[in-house]
From Swiss-Prot:
Binding-site residues for heme b b566, renumbered to this chain: 97, 196
Details of cofactor binding: Binds 2 heme b groups non-covalently.
Protein name according to UniProt: Cytochrome b
Keyword hit for Cell membrane: no
Organism per entry: Myotis capaccinii
GO (cellular component) term, any one: respiratory chain complex III
Length: 379
C-alpha cells in the first residue's frame, strides 16, 4: 500500500513542499528567513484576528478600544504587543531575506523574485494601514502625510487623495476602510506566498556558491525542518523578550495621545522599518520628485536581475562586490537613522548624500564592479 502522504491529493502537496522536497545540501542559515516569514505571517493573522474581535474602527472609539484591549481583555496586552512587535520581526526577517537574495544572486530566479517584490509592497501597505488603526497622534498625522503624497500625481492627484480619504481629510471613512483593507491584505499576501513558493519549487533553491546543486540534494525533512525550528526558537525568544520586557521600545510615545487634527506633532515619522524610504522621500526638495524616489527605492529591486553583469551568480567569491554590498547595508542603516531625525542642517545633507549613494550603488557601481571582476578573473 502506498504511503498516504504520497497518495492523498492534499497530503501530496504538503509532502512535495515540506517533506520530500529536494534541497541543496549546503544552504546556510541565511535560508532560514523564508520559513520565519511564513511563521510571522501566521502569527500576525492569528493575533490580528483576536484583536479585531475587540477593536472598533470608529474615530470616536478606536483609541479607547485599543486601551480596552490592553486593560480589560484577558491577555489583551500580550496580543497587542505580539502584533505590534511581530510586525517589527516580520520586517527584520523580510529585509534580511531580501539582502540574502541580493548577496547570493537569488534574484536570477526572476519569477520568484518579482512575486517577492510584490509581496514586499503588499506587506508595507498592510503595515502602514495597521499603524493608522490605534488612532493616536502619529497614526492620524502619519496617515495624513503619506496619503497626501498622492496629491503630487499630476492632474488626478487631488481627486485621488480625496477618494482614498472618503472625504476632505483623514476621518471616520478613512479609518473604516483602512481597517477593512488591513484585515483583507494578509489573506491576499498568503495567496501570493503560495505563488512565490510555486515559482521557487519550479526551479529549486539557490545555494551559497551560486552553482547548480542538482547533483547533491538532500530531503527537506528532517535536515532543514530541524534547522528551521532552531531559527524559529531564536526568533520567538527575541520577540518574547521584546514583548515582555520592552514592548514600547520600537513604538512612538506620541501614539499614546489620542488623534487631534488641531495639534500637529513636532516630528512626524513612520515606524522604524519605513524610515529609510522616508529619508529618501525627504531628501528631495520637490514633492513629485520625492514621491518618485520613494517608490523607486523599493521598485528598483525589480530591475536588479537586468543589472547583473557578473559571470558568477553569487557574491561569495567576489570581494569587490561584497564591499559594495556591505556599503549598501551601512547606507540603509544611515538612511534609517536620518529618517528619524528632524529636518535641520547636518541631517538634510547627510540624507541627500545617503540617498544618492543608495541609487548609485545599485544602478552604477554594482554592475561596473561586476564587469571589473569579470576582467580580473581572466588574469
Amino acid at each position: 500500500m502506498t504511503n498516504i502522504r504520497k497518495s492523498h491529493p492534499l497530503m501530496k502537496i504538503i509532502n512535495n513542499s515540506l517533506i520530500d522536497l529536494p534541497a541543496p545540501s549546503n544552504i546556510s542559515s541565511w535560508w532560514n528567513f523564508g520559513s520565519l516569514l511564513g511563521i510571522c505571517l501566521a502569527l500576525q493573522i492569528l493575533t490580528g484576528l483576536f484583536l479585531a474581535m475587540h477593536y472598533t474602527s470608529d474615530t470616536a472609539t478606536a483609541f479607547n478600544s485599543v486601551t480596552h484591549i490592553c486593560r480589560d481583555v484577558n491577555y489583551g496586552w500580550v496580543l497587542r504587543y505580539l502584533h505590534a512587535n511581530g510586525a517589527s520581526m516580520f520586517f527584520i526577517c523580510l529585509y534580511l531575506h531580501v539582502g540574502r537574495g541580493l548577496y547570493y544572486g537569488s534574484y536570477m530566479h526572476t519569477e520568484t523574485w518579482n512575486v517577492g517584490v510584490i509581496l514586499l509592497f503588499a506587506v508595507m501597505a498592510t503595515a502602514f494601514m495597521g499603524y493608522v488603526l490605534p488612532w493616536g497622534q502619529m497614526s492620524f498625522w502619519g496617515a495624513t502625510v503619506i496619503t497626501n503624497l498622492l496629491s503630487a500625481i499630476p492632474y488626478i492627484g487631488k481627486d485621488l487623495v480625496e477618494w482614498i480619504w472618503g472625504g476632505f481629510s483623514v476621518d471616520k471613512a478613512t479609518l473604516t476602510r483602512f481597517f477593512a483593507f488591513h484585515f483583507l491584505l494578509p489573506f491576499i499576501i498568503s495567496a501570493l506566498v503560495m505563488v512565490h513558493l510555486l515559482f521557487l519549487h519550479e526551479t529549486g533553491s539557490n545555494n551559497p556558491t551560486g552553482i547548480p546543486s542538482d547533483m547533491d540534494m538532500i530531503p527537506f525533512h528532517p535536515y532543514y525542518t530541524i534547522k528551521d525550528v532552531l531559527g524559529l526558537l531564536l526568533m520567538i525568544m527575541i520577540l518574547l523578550t521584546l514583548v515582555l520586557f520592552s514592548p514600547d521600545m520600537l513604538g512612538d510615545p506620541d501614539n499614546y495621545m489620542p488623534a487631534n487634527p488641531l495639534n500637529t506633532p513636532p516630528h512626524i515619522k513612520p515606524e522604524w522599518y519605513f524610515l529609510f524610504a522616508y529619508a529618501i522621500l525627504r531628501s528631495i526638495p520637490n514633492k513629485l520628485g520625492g514621491v518618485l524616489a520613494l517608490v523607486l527605492s523599493i521598485l528598483i529591486l525589480i530591475i536588479i536581475p537586468l543589472l547583473h553583469t557578473s559571470k558568477q551568480r553569487s557574491m561569495t567569491f567576489r570581494p569587490l562586490s561584497q564591499c559594495l554590498f556591505w556599503l549598501l547595508a551601512a547606507d540603509l542603516l544611515a538612511l534609517t537613522w536620518i529618517g528619524g531625525q528632524p529636518v535641520e542642517h547636518p541631517y538634510i545633507i547627510i540624507g541627500q548624500f545617503a540617498s544618492i549613494l543608495y541609487f548609485s550603488i545599485i544602478i552604477i557601481l554594482m554592475p561596473l564592479t561586476s564587469l571589473v571582476e569579470n576582467h580580473l578573473x581572466k588574469w
